[in-house]
Amino acid sequence: MSTEVAKKQEGILQNKSVCIIPARGGSKRIPRKNIKLFHGKPLIAYSIEVALKSNLFDKVIVSTDDEEIAKVAIEYGAIVPFLRPKELSDDFTGTGAVVNHTLEYLKNSGEEFDYCCTIYATAPLLNEKYLIEGFEKLKNSGAKNAFSCTSMPFPIQRTFKITTEQRCEMFWPENFMKRSQDLEEAYQDA
């Protein structure tokens, strides 16, 4: 019995789900980053492979504006049903708009999904067990969404900025004398 069939029988996959991997071609900081080689494979290949290996998704889709990225994505098993329009491919377009565009495209093509997962093309260390664990937590919690996070390596309550006068100014001066272990733990999205 295949892993996918076994998971469906266990109740993990009772609804339709899609994975959307946004991958713009015009990165300014690291040009062509989504297809740069990382340990012998294009960076985006790792995200596609982990999505496929998890067996959580009915479709793994790459939303891109770039023909070369599209070609690489298809080579590694993703679906690229369109090239993203220019107005959704600039430096100011957020992930939400890209995901919504893809979901609208799918809906207009007669496909609707109960669950949508976004994996960034720049996540080569993501492990499928965390995708499965996150999906199970989402389904069992009744929440509308879930995301990965990590604890901050230091207390954010002790952070400061450098003023225009080149002086340190704490964001929360009331915490200056507190011990770091007495401050509440904070998290950031990962």
Where do the language-model regions lie?
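N-terminal glycine-rich phosphate-binding loop and ensuing alpha1 helix
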Residues: 13-63
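Short, high-confidence coil segments that cap the C-terminus of an alpha-helix
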Residues: 57, 111-113, 142-143
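Residue-level signal for alpha-helix termini/capping positions
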Residues: 52, 107-108, 139
